[in-house]
């Protein structure tokens, strides 16, 4: 049986907060089906609402459709994460669909920090992320995509997986669009997919792709962009082997992007967490605090 689920989230400052106090970010959610918020947490104080998103069935299979929307109002700061990996399982026919549409208002902040996405062999799925930033809005997000289960001898060699990451702003319609298709189902596309995964211009034989980005609804000053790039390139004494960035760029003056490839999730995730902490301190003067659920 396919699961149909939706979750609509809304974050706003508490209108009843004392004028001299840091406004509390209130997070509310309305859900249908299995997708829901575990609870609202405030480990950094009242101004930043941490939400842990859960999907009790534990994975996404053919025919499932999950839709998440988030609205972050002016003055609010929301951090969204998950307690475990998002898994797209093998499908016997129908494709699965997961979508996120987030709108961030002027003066609001959003952090989109889910744990890794695992795409099993034979999965047929589409994962679409869209972020709409008003002038003055800012966000920090990441995506860690892992193909198959190499440690268990499972290669991703069949199925079709499509993913898109889209950042829009009122100042510029499309500062950044990332779209990738890995299609083994169509015999016309399968050879192209094989070359993409093997080529040094593509995945270079790796099975894990990590992406971290900082984006603004207003063009970032060149000094600020350069500082974010330098912070991402800084050596990390605690980094595990295979976790060095392959590229840190500003493809548009609204966004800075870090990219890594690797054979395992853990070293890349460790590096993402380290750079995310640096960017958070640099851009927002916030401590590099991490959600507690990552330590469980």
Curated annotation (Swiss-Prot):
Localization terms from the record: Cytoplasm
Keywords: Chaperone, Cytoplasm, Nickel insertion
MF (Gene Ontology): nickel cation binding
Coiled-coil region: none
Family to which the UniProt record says this protein belongs: Belongs to the UreD family.
PANTHER family in alphabetical order: UREASE ACCESSORY PROTEIN D (PTHR33643:SF1)
Protein's recorded name: Urease accessory protein UreD
